[in-house]
Amino acid sequence: MFFRYTVTLVANETDHHATVVQALLRRHIGDITPGTTQEIENALETVCGQSKEWSSTSLAAIIIAVVARSTSRLLVGPSLCRNNDYINLCIEYATEMESSAAKIRALVPFLRPLIAPYYCRRLAELRKLAHAHIAPLLAGPDSAPKEKNASSQYTAVQWLAQKLRGVPEETEERQVARIMFLNVISIFTVMMASLNVLYDILARPDVKRALLEEIAEVSGGKGDLGLGDVEFERLRRLDSCIRESQRLNPTNWIILEGQAQKDLTFSTGLCVEKGSYLSICGGAILKSNGPPLSTSSNPPPIDEFHAFRYVTPDSGISTDVSTANGNSNANSNLATAISPTNLTFGYGRMSCPGRYFAVHSIKAIVVGLLLRYDVEFEKKDGEERGRPRNVQAGNVIIPDPSVMVRVRARG
């Protein structure tokens, strides 16, 4: 997204925001997810309403509104995550950044430093508006965590203020820019994955029925009200569906981009000069390295969507959700797993520290939407439509945001 232009240089100079989120999610993910789930449930009710009459809307509009609130719960806490002005600002900032990046991408490289500031004027204005909301949280007396069970304790803004207290160059403006940067990354990560998996589910009624059966079994018939962290972990069919959707719908073809800091010579004799850029074609790897279904006489083709590809004895996850947690090999098949053949969330030290939070949020969104609402694609030219095609712009691949659905509350 050309962060050096769209977020100012704070995203490139230091990674304080990344280390704060990594520490927060590593130590307190179990304290954070209940509040996130609650926020998603409340946001769905607010955005979708309770009418039992069909209404037409963009599924992308629903998801981005819900994700903006759940992300804000983590970043700035309950005091701001239900503030409509702040949430609308976050959504506009995310969409404006994507739009600005697309314009900058179209420029020849030598023109970017000259013209990019013109394209990013609105982003600077939005950061100033965000400062009015976030600055009191950075400067307040409760910047550091105090009460162990306070839901507002586990927010990125408070941890960031604590980490950067006394660092002269870290002004409030820079810290606000970091929070807004995290906001954009979180919104797009969860939104794109949620849209993709929902498109895959809505296009396959049999998959939807199987997921609803699993939710009923795991929750004991209590629906999403009976789901805590442990129950969400036991939704192995849904987890498999998410991983399969991400496998076939990567957000970028090229990943793990880096620049050689010195001359490199590989064991094959290949030489890479200092300053050269290196990257991996992650999309091709994901689409060519599904799990081997060795004991199946007729394994599903690797280039086709198979929702429960990872819910088989061969993959190490029991098809019996009541015993799946006892399988020691299960983790390698989870949506959060990282490996040389599953690069959705990066790999090694470049792996995404927020992947557990992201997958939990995706599950909560899917469960809440499927249980509480009837959702179906609008017919296209009077005919039922299948899975919407993705939209590709250069290296970026996104689910079609223009797809319309019909929604009504379940009675």
From Swiss-Prot:
Name the UniProt key words of this record, in alphabetical order.
Glycoprotein, Heme, Iron, Membrane, Metal-binding, Monooxygenase, Oxidoreductase, Transmembrane, Transmembrane helix, Virulence
Which biological process annotations from GO are given for this protein? Answer: secondary metabolic process
Q: Where in the cell is it found?
A: Membrane
Report the coiled-coil segments.
none
Q: Which Pfam families match?
A: p450
Q: In which pathway does it act?
A: Mycotoxin biosynthesis
Cofactor(s) in the UniProt record: heme
Q: EC no.?
A: 1.-.-.-
Chief localization: membrane
* GO MF entries: heme binding; iron ion binding; monooxygenase activity; oxidoreductase activity, acting on paired donors, with incorporation or reduction of molecular oxygen
Q: What residue ranges are annotated as transmembrane?
A: 181-203
Secretion signal, residue range per the UniProt entry: none
Q: Which InterPro entries does UniProt cross-reference here?
A: Cyt_P450, Cyt_P450_E_grp-IV, Cyt_P450_sf
Which GO CC annotations does the UniProt entry carry? membrane
In the UniProt record, which residues carry a glycan? N12, N149, N342
Name the source's superkingdom: Eukaryota
Main EC class the enzyme belongs to? oxidoreductase
Bilayer topology reads: Single-pass membrane protein
User: Key word Transmembrane helix present in the record?
Assistant: yes
At which positions is heme bound? C352
What does this protein do, in the record's words? Cytochrome P450 monooxygenase; part of the gene cluster that mediates the biosynthesis of sirodesmin PL, an epipolythiodioxopiperazine (ETP) characterized by a disulfide bridged cyclic dipeptide and that acts as a phytotoxin which is involved in the blackleg didease of canola. SirD catalyzes the O-prenylation of L-tyrosine (L-Tyr) in the presence of dimethylallyl diphosphate (DMAPP) to yield 4-O-dimethylallyl-L-Tyr, and therefore represents probably the first pathway-specific enzyme in the biosynthesis of sirodesmin PL.
Name the family. Belongs to the cytochrome P450 family.
Name this protein carries in UniProt: Cytochrome P450 monooxygenase sirE
Organism (species): Leptosphaeria maculans
